[in-house]
Amino acid sequence: MSRRKIGVVVVAACAAVLPLVFASVSATSPSQASAIYFGMDAPLTGPTQLVGQSDRQAVDAVVAYWNSRGGIKGRRVVVDVLDNASNPSQAVQNVQKFISDPKYVGIFGSGNAAAAVATGAIASQAGIPFIALSPPTGLVEPPQPYAYILTATARLYAYSEAAYLKSIGVKRVWLMGDNGGYGRDGPAQVSKLAKKYGLEIVDTTIFSPASTDFSAELTRIKNSNAQALWLWTATPAGPTIVKQFKQLQLPQRLVLTGANVSPQFLQGTCGDVNGAIVNSFLATAWTFLPKTDPVRKEAALLRSILKRPVSNFDGDAAGALWAFKAAIEKGAATRAGINDALETKLRGVVTPAGRIFLSRRNHQGLQLDSMWVGRIQNCQVKPLFGKAFAKPKKK
């Protein structure tokens, strides 16, 4: 198997072919010997394949862009990708392969939250920098050595949206999430902050992402006193729930999260999703930022590299890419060097997703200032609430 010029190799998660693939990747030539290697564990198939495929496309495009301009510090970048099929057990096998090969200086952790949790601890113990492309709060609270989340965690999504719901008078919510990592983490985080924001949780529904009919669950919600349905899922069940929410004419407000901010979701639910409340980070609403905002410049660059609208998943990947690049430029292209730079030299680094702030005690990059909340109008997001979009007060 030959490696694509841009340095990204997608490998099927099949044990029979892995030795052959990695033998070809490891072949030594002058250009390969000087390359900087990363591993990427991604859900390219399975329930969260939209996440994994979007992550891979963003990594693919950005790495190609960097390599066409000299790579990082004059060295070509190579990202080897393994499919975990949205399965934490397969993710563990993938990450162990990256850990065992000393040429890999860092790992892009899975966009599947459960898989990221299962593998982040292993990478931490092995001493290899691991940046999850998903938002499992427990991975970084408390912080684990070498394990990071540069995108928003489920906790940050919850805090951002709870503040907005309070501001518009929503007090009673029904939580709904899939039985995966993100679908459980989100409702759990809302439960923890509910009292602070004056929220009453009427009930919580956890569902299988393989389900195709939610009419019974939605009818229960419709007949409740809940003012809003807050949905947590990045699976194909999301569009189904949105469509049935509209068909059953629920009177409640529909509340979505960044997991639903992608061209595929917005186009697939166009007409049904209009009016929904949603939140994300700055990469997905960069055109609304002031022209002087440095994040706008980085997000515009990402948009030009991708040649399509920026999704939440693109922002997840971009934050990790920008952080790894900054860490190598400020430190060294070694496992220890990258980790030291992440913990000590990345405060206020501008990425397409927002500014990231890391320290030895904080391994979550984005902060509340990089979040926005708004509505979906004409099948597009429109930010309404967030520090970056606040109009300066008149003196």
Where in the sequence are the language-model features?
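Periplasmic-binding protein-like
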Residues: 98-111, 131-133, 172-177, 225-235, ...
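Beta-alpha junction/loop-to-helix N-cap segments that form part of ligand/metal-binding clefts
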Residues: 35-37, 50-57, 69-139, 150, ...
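Extracellular/periplasmic Venus flytrap/periplasmic-binding protein
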Residues: 93, 137-139, 145-249, 287-297
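Immediate post-signal peptide segment of exported/extracytoplasmic ligand-binding proteins
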Residues: 28-40, 71-76, 165-171
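Short, low-complexity disordered leader/linker segments with a strong preference
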Residues: 1-37, 68, 389-395
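Extracytoplasmic "Venus flytrap"
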Residues: 36-59, 82-89, 111-114, 178-184, ...
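Segments of small-molecule ligand-sensing domains
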Residues: 304-314, 325-381
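Extracellular/periplasmic periplasmic-binding protein-like sensory domains
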Residues: 242-318, 375, 380-393
